[in-house]
Design a protein with these regions (language model features):
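Generic start-of-chain signal for non-secretory N-termini
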Residues: 1-22
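Catalytic-domain carbohydrate-binding cleft regions of carbohydrate-active enzymes
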Residues: 2-4, 11, 81, 93-585, ...
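A low-complexity, Ser/Thr/Gly/Pro-enriched, surface-exposed linker/loop concept
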Residues: 5-6, 30-69
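Short, well-ordered beta-strand segments enriched in hydrophobic/aromatic residues
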Residues: 27, 35-37, 74-81, 536-539, ...
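Surface-exposed beta-strand/loop patches in extracellular or lumenal glycoproteins
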Residues: 36-42, 545-558, 667-687
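Solvent-exposed beta-strand/loop surfaces of large extracellular or lumenal domains
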Residues: 48-62, 305, 563-583, 690-714
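A surface-exposed beta-strand-loop module
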Residues: 71-73, 79-80, 702-724
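Accessory, solvent-exposed terminal regions and/or long lumenal/extracellular loops of proteins
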Residues: 593-696, 719-721, 728-797
Length: 797
């Protein structure tokens, strides 16, 4: 094995024109707001990549240097740097960031950054909030990323300790330009890789002693129940655990299939593949390879150990020989049999033979890059190991408690990870262990999972603990199935966002303050987040109110008009409100003019291939555009020629509304040559004036009323992928008009209050309409009831 394949991509050497250097210091001007500072007593500096940083080759920014003798002054449009040329100290190195209050925009060396935080290594045993590590964004406008103690990357693909006791850190002084800050972080530390398409479907996972027969029966039950999954996770009992002879210790680590449970592993995995599943196996590699393992003889021989000695092969990711043996003799043979990727469940600390080197980082780095060896897109599944871990997706967040407190923390935890570039967390949806049974909690957690980077249902080894939908009450079962289907419908949208995350440096999930950093309200809703370009999400993390049968979520609605994804209800933005929903829905809002491509699903379909049938949601607004991007979903390299794009546009003016699907461009071989389109127009309640394909009237178009979003459905079948579709509505097409009184009636009908109060409230609303709010506030109503009435009557549309 050539270990050079483990060298990080990028050019770690900066441009000479960007450097200001002295006998013991070096300052590198990467951008006008991103500066590298180094100090070393021995006068040596680091030009190799590190565990965190892989590229310093930035265009030289504009800057000015003023040499004041004993003090050095550097100026850019964003920063003033004042440095005394000595060992870094609070009095000797000061940076002022442009904009804002001067007292809040000054940093002295050693100041603890007051940033917006980032993420954490794990949520293991979390029951609510946990501390988070630093991020790169701050309301003060600056933050610091310390790279002094990471390892350097050698040209041979191995890590190496750095020389001397040197200071090496990066100052981010972007003010509130959070998106620009993040994009330059990716430029410095490596881009987020493109994920395989199958990762965006639902994952099934359970810590349970499955047998091959039981797992197959489970998959067939999912098919019967129309609950789609695309990834089958098999936890640790796939290998020998309880049958390990005591002389070898525990069975926590293992690489030998338990043939009692899985008598024919290749056949089992082939069966799963034929049913549309990719397979990942759980491994805890800390105990190395012991003599009872099937692979032990060949592993021992390759490591220079006599197999007859039964001497264990110790786990050591600092040994190049072990790394080669570990992959070629343990993992590659099992991948040949059908394993698609590995769940690296490392829980054994941060110590290796090399001081300061974290074994988790080594596992993530080497496993991810090795996973390309079969010519497929790289993937691993493991915990976060510090800044730069975004290069090794997907993240496994660990074993959370099954409580409402855990659920409440998870939306914030997920969105906030973008502040350190970590965009692909996978949580134990529904919680892992302890806690309590609460069907409503499970429903809300699954809803969150569907609108999360990954949706992986999971639970611990407990006969009462499982996330199969049919184990819950009928209402929650229905909710779970509906949302599992929705996740698979969302794959075309999610996969396009996957490309955007990798190429544009824009994570799928982003905190609300990214786009409105000067709005105080955006910092007050930590559980709200953008979900790609078209949507924002405000998950419900509280129980239903017994009076209304609804639960609320505090929500900041950004500027503009927004529409409810599920029911088409319109909201005027620029304000903070409580949004109330029953158990069947959650607050997901779509910005005006949005176009959202979905997979059109009827019945059971767990395929994540580029679909032949597409469903497109089109929302009111003057204009909108969405480019659907598709490739084969698993090609190892992200090349332009792999992709096909389908551009969709919508315009609305005094002449009417026009929606166009342009002919597919690019590598059309990876998509069906003919497609059927279900186009749903929110709030338009007339048939189109005209439907054309390549300029010719399409007489076979079908039309239907869309009751869910109060609109019109246009159906076209077997349209060539290289054809243009155009749907035109007349300027006077009927538009849905909301009936406030009817909406209030529906709420009151279900409310658990006196009939007299129902009658009184309804009378006030009928008489005063949206002007009824002050009267309702004075009526001493249940807070939940008043909240939902306020939502309906103050939406502004």
């Amino acid at each position: 094995m050539d270990l050079k394949k483990f060298v990080l991509e990028g050019n770690p050497v900066c441009r000479k024109e960007a450097v200001i250097v002295g006998d013991h210091f070096r300052i590198t001007m990467l951008t006008t707001a991103l500066i590298r500072f180094e100090y070393s007593e021995d006068g040596g500096f680091e030009d190799r990549a590190t565990q965190m940083v892989c590229n310093r080759d930035f265009p030289v920014p504009e800057f000015r240097v003023s040499d004041g003798g004993e003090e050095l002054h550097i100026y850019t449009k964003d920063l003033e740097i004042h440095y005394d040329r000595q060992k870094f100290s609070p009095s000797g190195l000061m940076i002022r960031v442009a904009g804002g209050k001067a007292s809040e925009r000054v940093w002295h060396y050693g100041d603890e950054p007051k940033d917006l935080l980032g993420t954490a290594r794990t949520l293991d045993e979390a029951d609510g909030e946990i501390p988070l590590s630093h991020g790169i964004m701050s309301r003060n406008g600056f933050s610091v990323l310390d790279d002094s103690h990471t390892m350097a990357m050698g040209e041979d693909g191995m890590v190496e300790p750095r020389q001397g006791n040197r200071a090496d850190f990066y100052f981010f002084g972007y003010g509130h330009r959070y998106v620009e800050c993040l994009q330059d972080f990716y430029r410095l530390c490596g881009k987020t890789p493109l994920l395989p398409r199958y990762t965006f479907g639902n994952w099934w996972s359970r810590y349970h002693k499955y047998t091959e027969t039981e797992y197959k029966e489970l998959v067939e039950r999912f098919e019967k129940e129309e609950a789609p999954f695309s990834v089958a996770v098999v936890d640790m009992d796939w290998h020998l655990v309880e049958d390990v002879p005591p002389v070898y210790g525990s069975g926590w680590t293992g690489y030998t299939w338990n043939k009692k449970f899985f008598p024919n592993p290749p056949e089992f995995m082939d069966w799963l593949h034929k049913h549309g599943y990719k397979i990942t196996l759980n491994v805890h590699p800390a105990d190395g390879v012991r003599a009872y393992e099937e692979a032990y003889p060949r592993v021992a021989e390759k490591m220079g150990i006599d197999p007859a000695s039964k001497e264990p092969v110790l786990f050591d990711m600092t040994d190049p020989k072990f790394i080669e043996t570990y992959f070629e003799e343990l993992h590659h043979p099992m991948e040949e049999e059908g394993v698609d990727f590995w769940w690296l469940d490392w829980q054994q600390g941060t110590v290796t033979k090399v001081p300061g080197l974290d074994p988790l980082w080594m596992l993530n780095h080497y496993h991810y890059l090795d996973s390309k060896w079969k010519g497929k897109r790289a993937l691993t599944f493991s915990r976060y190991a510090g800044p730069g871990s975004h290069r090794y997706p997907v993240g496994f967040s660990g074993d959370t408690f099954i409580t409402w407190e855990s659920l409440k923390f998870q939306p914030y935890f997920t969105a906030n990870a973008s502040n350190i570039g970590f965009g692909w967390w996978s949580h134990d949806i529904g919680g892992h262990m302890f806690g309590y049974r609460d069907d409503e909690l499970t429903a809300r957690w699954v809803q969150l999972g569907v609108f999360s980077p990954m949706n992986r249902l999971h639970s611990t080894d407990n006969p009462f603990n499982g996330k199969e939908p049919w184990k819950y009450n009928q209402i929650v079962e229905t909710v779970m199935k509906n949302f599992l289907k929705l996740r698979h419908k969302l794959v075309p949208y999610l996969y396009t966002m996957n490309r955007r995350a990798s190429r544009a440096g824009l994570p799928l999930v982003q905190p609300m303050y990214y786009l409105e950093p000067e709005r105080e309200e955006t910092y007050e809703v930590p559980n709200n987040y953008y979900f790609g370009t078209e949507m924002m999400v405000s998950p419900i993390t509280d129980k239903l109110d017994p009076v209304t049968g609804l639960a609320g979520a505090k929500t900041w609605i950004p500027q503009g008009i927004w529409y409810d994804f599920f029911n088409g209800r319109a909201y005027k933005g620029g304000r903070k409100v409580d949004l109330w929903r029953d158990i069947y829905e959650m607050p997901v809002l779509v910005r005006e003019g949005s176009i959202i491509p979905l997979k059109d699903m009827e019945g059971y379909d767990n395929s994540i291939e580029n679909p032949e049938k597409l469903e497109v949601l089109v929302y009111p607004g003057e204009s909108g555009e969405f480019v659907l991007w598709e490739d084969d979903g698993d090609t190892p390299e992200d090349l332009d020629e792999n992709w096909v794009s389908t551009r969709m546009t919508k315009t609305a003016d005094e002449n009417g509304t026009v929606f166009i699907v342009e002919a597919a461009q690019g590598n059309t071989a990876v998509i069906p040559q003919k497609r059927s389109w279900k186009i749903r127009f929110c709030n338009i309640q007339d048939k189109p004036q005209e439907v054309t394909v390549n300029g010719q009237v399409y007489k076979d178009a079908e039309f239907a009323e869309d009751e869910k979003i109060h609109g019109t459905i246009v159906l076209l079948k077997d349209v060539p992928a290289d054809a243009q579709v155009k749907v035109t509505f007349a300027a006077d097409a009927a538009v849905y008009q909301r009936d406030y009184a009817e909406e209030v009636y529906e709420i009151l009908e279900k409310a658990q209050i006196t009939y007299a109060q129902k009658t009184e409230v309804y009378k006030v609303v009928k008489e005063l309409g949206t002007e009824a709010v002050p009267v309702l506030v004075s009526m001493n109503l249940n807070p939940s009831l008043l909240g939902v009435l306020m939502e309906i009557l103050t939406m502004g549309i």
